Amino acid sequence: MLSLTIKELVSHFKAKKCSPVDICATCIKEINDSSFLNAFVTVLPEAAEKQARESHARWKSGKPRGPLDGVPIAVKDNFCMTGVRTTCGSRMLANFYPPYTATVVERLQGEGAVVLGKTNMDEFGMGSGATDSAFGPTKNPWKNAGEAADDWYITGGSSGGSAVAVATGCSFGALGSDTGGSTRNPASRCGVVGLKPTYGALSRHGLIPLTNSMDVPGILAKCVDDAAVLLSATACADPNDSTSVSAPDSVRHLKLAGEPSLKGVKIGVPKEYHCPGMCPEVLDLWRDVADRLAALGAVVSSVSLPHSRYSTECYSVLNCCEVASNFARYDGLEYGHRASDDSSTDALYAASRHEGLNEVVRGRILAGNYFLLRANYEKYFTKALQVRRLISDDFTKVFASGVELLLTPVTLTAALRHSEWTLKDNRERASVEDFCTQPVNMAGLPAVSVPCRLSREGLPLSLQLVGPKFSEAAMLAAAKRLELELSFPRLDLQLHAHQESYATL
Protein backbone atom coordinates (compact mmCIF):
# COMPACT_ATOMS: atom_id res chain seq x y z
CA MET A 1 0.00 0.00 0.00
CA LEU A 2 2.86 2.40 0.70
CA SER A 3 3.94 2.24 -2.95
CA LEU A 4 0.63 3.73 -4.15
CA THR A 5 0.49 7.25 -5.57
CA ILE A 6 -1.88 9.80 -4.07
CA LYS A 7 -4.40 9.29 -6.86
CA GLU A 8 -4.23 5.51 -6.43
CA LEU A 9 -4.63 5.80 -2.66
CA VAL A 10 -7.69 8.03 -2.99
CA SER A 11 -9.17 5.52 -5.45
CA HIS A 12 -8.69 2.85 -2.79
CA PHE A 13 -10.51 5.05 -0.27
CA LYS A 14 -13.39 5.50 -2.71
CA ALA A 15 -13.59 1.76 -3.35
CA LYS A 16 -13.31 1.04 0.40
CA LYS A 17 -10.25 -1.16 -0.18
CA CYS A 18 -8.55 0.57 2.75
CA SER A 19 -9.23 3.40 5.17
CA PRO A 20 -7.30 6.53 6.17
CA VAL A 21 -6.93 5.01 9.65
CA ASP A 22 -5.23 1.88 8.26
CA ILE A 23 -2.91 3.88 6.01
CA CYS A 24 -1.98 6.29 8.81
CA ALA A 25 -1.07 3.40 11.11
CA THR A 26 1.00 1.77 8.36
CA CYS A 27 2.88 5.01 7.70
CA ILE A 28 3.62 5.56 11.39
CA LYS A 29 4.97 2.00 11.61
CA GLU A 30 7.16 2.62 8.56
CA ILE A 31 8.49 5.83 10.11
CA ASN A 32 9.46 3.92 13.24
CA ASP A 33 10.95 1.02 11.27
CA SER A 34 12.97 3.48 9.16
CA SER A 35 14.17 5.59 12.07
CA PHE A 36 17.77 4.62 11.27
CA LEU A 37 17.53 6.91 8.23
CA ASN A 38 16.72 9.83 10.58
CA ALA A 39 14.16 11.39 8.24
CA PHE A 40 11.89 12.73 11.00
CA VAL A 41 12.67 15.09 13.87
CA THR A 42 9.17 14.93 15.36
CA VAL A 43 6.49 12.27 14.79
CA LEU A 44 2.85 13.02 15.65
CA PRO A 45 1.11 9.63 15.99
CA GLU A 46 -1.79 10.74 18.20
CA ALA A 47 -2.61 13.86 16.18
CA ALA A 48 -2.26 11.96 12.91
CA GLU A 49 -4.52 9.16 14.12
CA LYS A 50 -7.17 11.72 15.14
CA GLN A 51 -7.03 13.38 11.70
CA ALA A 52 -7.23 9.95 10.03
CA ARG A 53 -10.33 9.00 12.04
CA GLU A 54 -12.01 12.25 11.06
CA SER A 55 -11.14 11.61 7.42
CA HIS A 56 -12.48 8.07 7.62
CA ALA A 57 -15.79 9.44 8.91
CA ARG A 58 -15.99 11.84 5.97
CA TRP A 59 -15.29 9.07 3.45
CA LYS A 60 -17.82 6.83 5.16
CA SER A 61 -20.49 9.53 4.88
CA GLY A 62 -19.58 10.17 1.24
CA LYS A 63 -18.35 13.71 1.93
CA PRO A 64 -14.56 13.80 1.49
CA ARG A 65 -13.07 17.27 1.37
CA GLY A 66 -11.13 16.65 -1.82
CA PRO A 67 -8.32 14.71 -3.51
CA LEU A 68 -6.10 14.80 -0.41
CA ASP A 69 -8.58 13.69 2.24
CA GLY A 70 -6.90 11.04 4.39
CA VAL A 71 -3.59 11.24 2.53
CA PRO A 72 -0.54 11.10 4.88
CA ILE A 73 1.82 14.06 4.41
CA ALA A 74 5.15 15.05 5.99
CA VAL A 75 6.20 18.64 6.71
CA LYS A 76 9.74 20.01 6.72
CA ASP A 77 10.72 21.28 10.15
CA ASN A 78 10.95 24.93 9.12
CA PHE A 79 7.17 25.27 8.70
CA CYS A 80 5.34 26.44 11.82
CA MET A 81 2.54 24.35 13.30
CA THR A 82 0.57 25.48 16.34
CA GLY A 83 1.89 23.76 19.45
CA VAL A 84 4.22 21.47 17.48
CA ARG A 85 7.97 21.76 18.04
CA THR A 86 9.54 23.53 15.05
CA THR A 87 13.33 23.39 15.16
CA CYS A 88 14.74 24.22 11.71
CA GLY A 89 17.24 21.47 12.55
CA SER A 90 18.93 23.79 15.03
CA ARG A 91 19.70 23.80 18.72
CA MET A 92 18.65 27.46 18.66
CA LEU A 93 15.01 26.41 18.17
CA ALA A 94 15.15 23.00 19.82
CA ASN A 95 12.27 23.93 22.12
CA PHE A 96 10.33 26.39 19.96
CA TYR A 97 6.57 25.77 19.82
CA PRO A 98 4.92 28.25 17.41
CA PRO A 99 1.56 29.87 18.25
CA TYR A 100 0.31 29.63 14.64
CA THR A 101 0.39 27.32 11.61
CA ALA A 102 1.95 28.03 8.22
CA THR A 103 -0.59 28.81 5.50
CA VAL A 104 0.52 25.95 3.23
CA VAL A 105 0.10 23.48 6.10
CA GLU A 106 -3.32 24.92 6.91
CA ARG A 107 -4.37 24.49 3.29
CA LEU A 108 -3.27 20.85 3.25
CA GLN A 109 -5.11 20.18 6.50
CA GLY A 110 -8.12 22.01 5.10
CA GLU A 111 -8.15 19.48 2.26
CA GLY A 112 -8.13 16.66 4.81
CA ALA A 113 -4.46 15.68 4.55
CA VAL A 114 -3.06 13.85 7.59
CA VAL A 115 0.16 15.42 8.90
CA LEU A 116 2.45 12.66 10.21
CA GLY A 117 5.29 14.76 11.56
CA LYS A 118 8.17 17.16 10.92
CA THR A 119 11.15 16.14 8.79
CA ASN A 120 14.87 16.60 9.29
CA MET A 121 16.87 19.25 7.43
CA ASP A 122 20.19 21.06 7.27
CA GLU A 123 20.28 23.66 10.03
CA PHE A 124 18.04 26.56 8.96
CA GLY A 125 18.20 25.23 5.39
CA MET A 126 21.87 26.15 4.97
CA GLY A 127 23.20 23.03 3.31
CA SER A 128 22.97 20.69 0.36
CA GLY A 129 23.39 17.33 2.06
CA ALA A 130 20.97 17.11 5.02
CA THR A 131 24.09 16.41 7.06
CA ASP A 132 24.19 19.56 9.21
CA SER A 133 21.14 19.10 11.44
CA ALA A 134 21.51 19.41 15.20
CA PHE A 135 19.56 16.13 15.33
CA GLY A 136 22.00 14.20 13.17
CA PRO A 137 22.26 13.57 9.42
CA THR A 138 19.64 11.95 7.21
CA LYS A 139 20.76 8.92 5.20
CA ASN A 140 19.90 8.01 1.62
CA PRO A 141 17.68 4.89 1.45
CA TRP A 142 18.80 3.83 -2.01
CA LYS A 143 22.13 2.31 -1.12
CA ASN A 144 24.26 1.36 1.86
CA ALA A 145 27.87 2.06 0.89
CA GLY A 146 29.58 -0.06 3.52
CA GLU A 147 30.08 -0.81 7.17
CA ALA A 148 32.26 2.15 8.19
CA ALA A 149 30.63 4.74 10.44
CA ASP A 150 30.59 7.45 7.75
CA ASP A 151 30.33 5.19 4.68
CA TRP A 152 26.75 5.94 3.64
CA TYR A 153 25.27 8.13 0.92
CA ILE A 154 23.91 11.63 1.48
CA THR A 155 20.33 12.54 0.60
CA GLY A 156 20.97 16.02 -0.71
CA GLY A 157 19.50 18.98 1.08
CA SER A 158 18.34 20.86 2.75
CA SER A 159 14.96 19.06 2.54
CA GLY A 160 16.57 15.64 2.88
CA GLY A 161 14.12 14.33 5.47
CA SER A 162 11.12 15.15 3.28
CA ALA A 163 12.71 13.44 0.27
CA VAL A 164 13.44 10.28 2.27
CA ALA A 165 9.93 10.27 3.75
CA VAL A 166 8.43 10.17 0.25
CA ALA A 167 10.99 7.77 -1.24
CA THR A 168 10.49 5.19 1.51
CA GLY A 169 6.70 5.42 1.54
CA CYS A 170 6.60 6.91 5.04
CA SER A 171 4.44 9.66 3.53
CA PHE A 172 2.62 10.08 0.23
CA GLY A 173 3.89 13.62 -0.24
CA ALA A 174 5.87 16.20 1.67
CA LEU A 175 6.52 19.90 2.02
CA GLY A 176 10.05 21.14 1.58
CA SER A 177 11.44 24.61 1.04
CA ASP A 178 13.58 25.84 -1.84
CA THR A 179 15.92 28.82 -1.56
CA GLY A 180 18.69 27.69 -3.91
CA GLY A 181 17.63 24.15 -4.75
CA SER A 182 16.72 22.69 -1.37
CA THR A 183 13.69 20.80 -2.70
CA ARG A 184 15.01 19.79 -6.13
CA ASN A 185 18.42 18.68 -4.88
CA PRO A 186 17.26 16.00 -2.39
CA ALA A 187 14.45 14.97 -4.74
CA SER A 188 17.14 14.29 -7.33
CA ARG A 189 19.29 12.34 -4.87
CA CYS A 190 16.39 10.25 -3.55
CA GLY A 191 14.56 9.49 -6.79
CA VAL A 192 11.36 11.48 -6.23
CA VAL A 193 9.76 14.47 -7.94
CA GLY A 194 10.75 17.86 -6.52
CA LEU A 195 8.72 20.95 -7.49
CA LYS A 196 9.81 24.54 -6.90
CA PRO A 197 6.79 26.72 -7.72
CA THR A 198 6.91 30.26 -9.07
CA TYR A 199 7.89 32.75 -6.36
CA GLY A 200 4.64 34.04 -4.87
CA ALA A 201 2.40 31.17 -6.00
CA LEU A 202 2.50 29.64 -2.50
CA SER A 203 2.39 31.61 0.72
CA ARG A 204 5.57 31.91 2.78
CA HIS A 205 3.59 32.79 5.92
CA GLY A 206 4.81 30.44 8.63
CA LEU A 207 7.90 29.35 6.71
CA ILE A 208 10.78 30.41 8.96
CA PRO A 209 12.82 32.63 6.64
CA LEU A 210 16.29 32.04 5.33
CA THR A 211 16.44 34.38 2.33
CA ASN A 212 13.10 36.16 1.94
CA SER A 213 13.59 37.18 -1.67
CA MET A 214 14.21 33.58 -2.80
CA ASP A 215 12.50 31.25 -0.28
CA VAL A 216 9.52 29.30 -1.59
CA PRO A 217 7.64 26.30 -0.18
CA GLY A 218 8.51 23.22 -2.22
CA ILE A 219 6.68 19.98 -2.96
CA LEU A 220 8.08 16.44 -2.94
CA ALA A 221 6.02 13.62 -4.41
CA LYS A 222 6.27 10.13 -5.87
CA CYS A 223 5.15 11.25 -9.32
CA VAL A 224 4.32 14.36 -11.32
CA ASP A 225 0.55 13.86 -10.99
CA ASP A 226 0.88 13.87 -7.20
CA ALA A 227 3.00 17.03 -7.30
CA ALA A 228 0.27 18.69 -9.37
CA VAL A 229 -2.41 17.72 -6.82
CA LEU A 230 -0.34 19.13 -3.95
CA LEU A 231 0.40 22.32 -5.89
CA SER A 232 -3.26 22.98 -6.62
CA ALA A 233 -4.11 22.42 -2.96
CA THR A 234 -1.53 24.87 -1.65
CA ALA A 235 -1.39 27.69 -4.24
CA CYS A 236 -3.13 30.84 -3.06
CA ALA A 237 -2.83 34.54 -2.41
CA ASP A 238 -2.44 35.13 1.32
CA PRO A 239 -3.07 38.43 3.13
CA ASN A 240 -0.44 37.33 5.65
CA ASP A 241 2.24 37.25 2.91
CA SER A 242 2.58 40.41 0.83
CA THR A 243 4.77 38.58 -1.71
CA SER A 244 2.07 36.02 -2.50
CA VAL A 245 -0.12 36.49 -5.56
CA SER A 246 -3.28 35.01 -6.98
CA ALA A 247 -1.86 32.43 -9.36
CA PRO A 248 -3.68 31.69 -12.64
CA ASP A 249 -6.39 29.03 -12.71
CA SER A 250 -3.93 26.81 -14.60
CA VAL A 251 -1.90 26.62 -11.38
CA ARG A 252 -4.69 26.63 -8.77
CA HIS A 253 -6.79 24.07 -10.65
CA LEU A 254 -4.08 22.12 -12.43
CA LYS A 255 -5.13 19.00 -14.32
CA LEU A 256 -2.70 16.99 -16.43
CA ALA A 257 -3.63 14.90 -19.45
CA GLY A 258 -3.12 11.14 -19.25
CA GLU A 259 -0.34 11.28 -21.84
CA PRO A 260 0.62 14.90 -22.58
CA SER A 261 1.94 15.68 -26.04
CA LEU A 262 5.32 17.31 -26.59
CA LYS A 263 4.80 17.86 -30.30
CA GLY A 264 6.14 21.29 -31.22
CA VAL A 265 7.13 22.22 -27.67
CA LYS A 266 10.31 24.31 -27.85
CA ILE A 267 12.87 23.18 -25.27
CA GLY A 268 16.20 24.93 -24.73
CA VAL A 269 19.41 23.35 -23.47
CA PRO A 270 21.59 26.03 -21.80
CA LYS A 271 25.19 25.56 -22.90
CA GLU A 272 26.57 27.30 -19.80
CA TYR A 273 25.22 24.48 -17.61
CA HIS A 274 27.78 22.13 -19.17
CA CYS A 275 30.26 23.17 -16.53
CA PRO A 276 33.40 21.90 -14.76
CA GLY A 277 32.66 19.19 -12.22
CA MET A 278 29.83 17.53 -14.14
CA CYS A 279 30.31 13.77 -14.08
CA PRO A 280 30.11 11.86 -17.40
CA GLU A 281 26.98 9.97 -16.31
CA VAL A 282 25.01 13.19 -15.79
CA LEU A 283 26.24 14.60 -19.10
CA ASP A 284 25.30 11.40 -20.95
CA LEU A 285 21.86 11.44 -19.31
CA TRP A 286 21.32 15.08 -20.28
CA ARG A 287 22.18 14.39 -23.92
CA ASP A 288 20.12 11.20 -24.05
CA VAL A 289 17.01 12.82 -22.59
CA ALA A 290 17.31 15.79 -24.96
CA ASP A 291 17.38 13.30 -27.87
CA ARG A 292 14.38 11.42 -26.49
CA LEU A 293 12.40 14.63 -26.08
CA ALA A 294 13.16 15.45 -29.71
CA ALA A 295 11.99 11.97 -30.72
CA LEU A 296 8.71 12.70 -28.91
CA GLY A 297 8.18 15.74 -31.11
CA ALA A 298 9.78 18.52 -29.08
CA VAL A 299 11.93 21.11 -30.82
CA VAL A 300 15.20 20.99 -28.88
CA SER A 301 17.90 23.63 -29.37
CA SER A 302 20.94 25.06 -27.62
CA VAL A 303 20.42 28.37 -25.82
CA SER A 304 22.62 30.73 -23.85
CA LEU A 305 22.23 32.02 -20.29
CA PRO A 306 25.57 33.85 -20.16
CA HIS A 307 25.36 35.28 -16.66
CA SER A 308 24.51 31.97 -14.98
CA ARG A 309 28.23 31.37 -14.63
CA TYR A 310 28.25 34.01 -11.89
CA SER A 311 25.29 32.55 -10.02
CA THR A 312 27.20 30.81 -7.22
CA GLU A 313 29.06 33.95 -6.17
CA CYS A 314 26.00 36.18 -6.62
CA TYR A 315 23.76 33.86 -4.65
CA SER A 316 26.33 33.54 -1.88
CA VAL A 317 26.54 37.30 -1.33
CA LEU A 318 22.77 37.86 -1.39
CA ASN A 319 22.05 34.84 0.78
CA CYS A 320 24.59 35.89 3.41
CA CYS A 321 23.28 39.46 3.49
CA GLU A 322 19.68 38.37 4.04
CA VAL A 323 20.77 35.78 6.60
CA ALA A 324 22.66 38.44 8.56
CA SER A 325 19.48 40.52 8.70
CA ASN A 326 17.03 37.69 9.42
CA PHE A 327 19.14 36.04 12.10
CA ALA A 328 19.53 39.15 14.24
CA ARG A 329 16.33 37.95 15.96
CA TYR A 330 18.10 34.92 17.45
CA ASP A 331 19.64 36.67 20.43
CA GLY A 332 18.67 34.42 23.35
CA LEU A 333 16.21 36.94 24.78
CA GLU A 334 12.83 36.78 23.05
CA TYR A 335 12.90 33.09 22.14
CA GLY A 336 15.34 30.40 21.11
CA HIS A 337 18.31 28.99 22.96
CA ARG A 338 19.50 31.10 25.89
CA ALA A 339 23.02 30.59 27.20
CA SER A 340 23.78 30.58 30.91
CA ASP A 341 26.40 33.34 30.58
CA ASP A 342 24.46 36.49 31.43
CA SER A 343 27.33 38.55 32.79
CA SER A 344 26.36 41.20 30.24
CA THR A 345 23.93 41.59 27.37
CA ASP A 346 26.75 41.28 24.84
CA ALA A 347 28.04 38.14 26.55
CA LEU A 348 24.55 36.63 26.52
CA TYR A 349 24.12 37.41 22.82
CA ALA A 350 27.49 35.94 21.92
CA ALA A 351 27.16 32.79 24.01
CA SER A 352 23.58 32.08 22.91
CA ARG A 353 24.44 32.39 19.22
CA HIS A 354 27.67 30.40 19.57
CA GLU A 355 25.91 27.55 21.38
CA GLY A 356 22.69 27.68 19.37
CA LEU A 357 23.99 28.04 15.81
CA ASN A 358 26.41 25.79 13.97
CA GLU A 359 29.58 26.90 12.20
CA VAL A 360 27.96 27.16 8.77
CA VAL A 361 25.19 29.46 10.03
CA ARG A 362 27.58 31.62 12.04
CA GLY A 363 29.87 31.87 9.02
CA ARG A 364 27.07 33.17 6.80
CA ILE A 365 26.04 35.73 9.41
CA LEU A 366 29.61 37.00 9.65
CA ALA A 367 30.00 37.12 5.87
CA GLY A 368 26.70 38.95 5.47
CA ASN A 369 27.63 41.55 8.05
CA TYR A 370 30.93 42.07 6.23
CA PHE A 371 29.22 42.50 2.85
CA LEU A 372 26.79 45.01 4.38
CA LEU A 373 29.45 47.23 5.96
CA ARG A 374 29.22 50.79 4.67
CA ALA A 375 32.61 50.40 3.00
CA ASN A 376 31.56 47.18 1.25
CA TYR A 377 27.84 47.69 0.55
CA GLU A 378 28.18 48.98 -3.01
CA LYS A 379 31.02 46.62 -3.86
CA TYR A 380 29.25 43.44 -2.76
CA PHE A 381 25.53 43.77 -2.05
CA THR A 382 24.62 46.32 -4.73
CA LYS A 383 26.79 44.58 -7.31
CA ALA A 384 25.22 41.21 -6.50
CA LEU A 385 21.74 42.70 -6.97
CA GLN A 386 22.81 43.95 -10.40
CA VAL A 387 24.17 40.54 -11.38
CA ARG A 388 20.96 38.91 -10.14
CA ARG A 389 19.01 41.15 -12.51
CA LEU A 390 21.29 40.10 -15.39
CA ILE A 391 20.73 36.42 -14.54
CA SER A 392 16.97 36.98 -14.49
CA ASP A 393 17.07 38.94 -17.74
CA ASP A 394 18.85 36.03 -19.45
CA PHE A 395 15.87 33.79 -18.71
CA THR A 396 13.44 36.49 -19.86
CA LYS A 397 15.23 36.86 -23.20
CA VAL A 398 15.34 33.12 -23.84
CA PHE A 399 11.64 32.67 -23.12
CA ALA A 400 10.79 35.78 -25.17
CA SER A 401 12.59 34.17 -28.13
CA GLY A 402 9.97 31.42 -28.25
CA VAL A 403 11.61 28.80 -26.06
CA GLU A 404 8.95 27.36 -23.73
CA LEU A 405 10.99 25.22 -21.33
CA LEU A 406 14.61 24.59 -20.38
CA LEU A 407 16.22 21.21 -19.72
CA THR A 408 19.17 21.16 -17.32
CA PRO A 409 20.87 18.91 -14.77
CA VAL A 410 19.89 19.27 -11.12
CA THR A 411 23.22 18.35 -9.55
CA LEU A 412 26.48 17.61 -11.30
CA THR A 413 27.00 14.15 -9.78
CA ALA A 414 25.08 11.30 -8.21
CA ALA A 415 24.85 11.24 -4.40
CA LEU A 416 28.22 11.19 -2.68
CA ARG A 417 29.34 9.03 0.21
CA HIS A 418 29.30 10.94 3.47
CA SER A 419 33.03 10.29 3.78
CA GLU A 420 33.57 12.09 0.44
CA TRP A 421 31.12 14.85 1.29
CA THR A 422 32.92 15.81 4.49
CA LEU A 423 36.15 16.37 2.57
CA LYS A 424 34.57 19.31 0.72
CA ASP A 425 34.20 22.75 2.29
CA ASN A 426 30.88 24.57 2.18
CA ARG A 427 31.84 26.70 -0.83
CA GLU A 428 32.98 23.69 -2.86
CA ARG A 429 29.76 21.84 -2.01
CA ALA A 430 27.65 24.75 -3.26
CA SER A 431 29.54 24.97 -6.56
CA VAL A 432 28.78 21.30 -7.26
CA GLU A 433 25.36 20.93 -5.67
CA ASP A 434 23.66 24.22 -6.48
CA PHE A 435 25.13 25.58 -9.72
CA CYS A 436 22.16 24.44 -11.82
CA THR A 437 19.45 25.27 -9.28
CA GLN A 438 20.34 28.66 -7.77
CA PRO A 439 19.72 30.76 -10.92
CA VAL A 440 16.06 29.68 -10.97
CA ASN A 441 15.54 31.02 -7.44
CA MET A 442 17.18 34.33 -8.30
CA ALA A 443 14.79 34.67 -11.26
CA GLY A 444 11.71 33.51 -9.30
CA LEU A 445 10.85 30.84 -11.89
CA PRO A 446 9.19 27.43 -11.51
CA ALA A 447 11.27 24.28 -11.90
CA VAL A 448 10.77 20.57 -11.37
CA SER A 449 13.29 17.79 -10.75
CA VAL A 450 12.33 14.55 -12.51
CA PRO A 451 14.06 11.23 -11.67
CA CYS A 452 15.39 9.69 -14.87
CA ARG A 453 17.60 6.65 -14.30
CA LEU A 454 19.96 4.95 -11.86
CA SER A 455 23.70 5.49 -11.98
CA ARG A 456 26.11 2.59 -12.39
CA GLU A 457 26.25 2.47 -8.58
CA GLY A 458 22.46 2.21 -8.33
CA LEU A 459 21.80 5.80 -7.23
CA PRO A 460 19.14 8.12 -8.72
CA LEU A 461 20.01 10.63 -11.42
CA SER A 462 17.56 13.40 -12.30
CA LEU A 463 17.12 16.31 -14.68
CA GLN A 464 15.31 19.62 -14.27
CA LEU A 465 12.71 21.39 -16.37
CA VAL A 466 12.41 25.17 -15.98
CA GLY A 467 9.63 27.38 -17.30
CA PRO A 468 8.53 31.03 -17.33
CA LYS A 469 6.66 32.38 -14.32
CA PHE A 470 3.34 30.61 -13.66
CA SER A 471 3.96 28.05 -16.43
CA GLU A 472 3.57 25.14 -14.00
CA ALA A 473 0.84 23.53 -16.12
CA ALA A 474 2.98 23.31 -19.27
CA MET A 475 6.11 22.45 -17.30
CA LEU A 476 4.48 19.63 -15.35
CA ALA A 477 2.80 18.30 -18.50
CA ALA A 478 6.24 17.96 -20.11
CA ALA A 479 7.60 16.46 -16.89
CA LYS A 480 4.82 13.87 -16.86
CA ARG A 481 5.50 12.92 -20.48
CA LEU A 482 9.17 12.53 -19.63
CA GLU A 483 8.27 10.46 -16.58
CA LEU A 484 6.14 8.12 -18.71
CA GLU A 485 8.91 7.81 -21.29
CA LEU A 486 11.69 6.99 -18.83
CA SER A 487 9.82 4.72 -16.37
CA PHE A 488 12.17 5.42 -13.47
CA PRO A 489 12.22 2.48 -11.02
CA ARG A 490 10.84 3.24 -7.58
CA LEU A 491 12.68 2.23 -4.45
CA ASP A 492 12.01 -1.42 -3.58
CA LEU A 493 10.29 -0.92 -0.23
CA GLN A 494 10.60 -4.59 0.75
CA LEU A 495 14.35 -4.53 0.13
CA HIS A 496 14.65 -1.18 1.90
CA ALA A 497 12.87 -2.59 4.96
CA HIS A 498 15.63 -5.15 5.42
CA GLN A 499 18.60 -2.76 5.22
CA GLU A 500 19.18 -3.09 8.96
CA SER A 501 22.93 -2.59 8.57
CA TYR A 502 22.13 1.14 8.33
CA ALA A 503 20.94 1.06 11.91
CA THR A 504 24.45 0.51 13.24
CA LEU A 505 26.00 3.46 11.44
Curated annotation (Swiss-Prot):
GO terms for molecular function: ATP binding; glutaminyl-tRNA synthase (glutamine-hydrolyzing) activity. It comes from the Eukaryota. The active site is at K76 (charge relay system), S158 (charge relay system), S182 (acyl-ester intermediate). GO terms for cellular component: glutamyl-tRNA(Gln) amidotransferase complex; mitochondrion. Coiled coil: none annotated. GO terms for biological process: glutaminyl-tRNAGln biosynthesis via transamidation; mitochondrial translation. It holds the Pfam family Amidase. Gene3D superfamilies: Amidase signature (AS) domain. It is found in: Mitochondrion. Keywords: ATP-binding, Ligase, Mitochondrion, Nucleotide-binding, Protein biosynthesis. It catalyses: L-glutamyl-tRNA(Gln) + L-glutamine + ATP + H2O = L-glutaminyl-tRNA(Gln) + L-glutamate + ADP + phosphate + H(+). Allows the formation of correctly charged Gln-tRNA(Gln) through the transamidation of misacylated Glu-tRNA(Gln) in the mitochondria. The reaction takes place in the presence of glutamine and ATP through an activated gamma-phospho-Glu-tRNA(Gln). Subunit of the heterotrimeric GatCAB amidotransferase (AdT) complex, composed of A, B and C subunits. This is Glutamyl-tRNA(Gln) amidotransferase subunit A, mitochondrial. It comes from Ixodes scapularis (Black-legged tick). The gene is gatA.
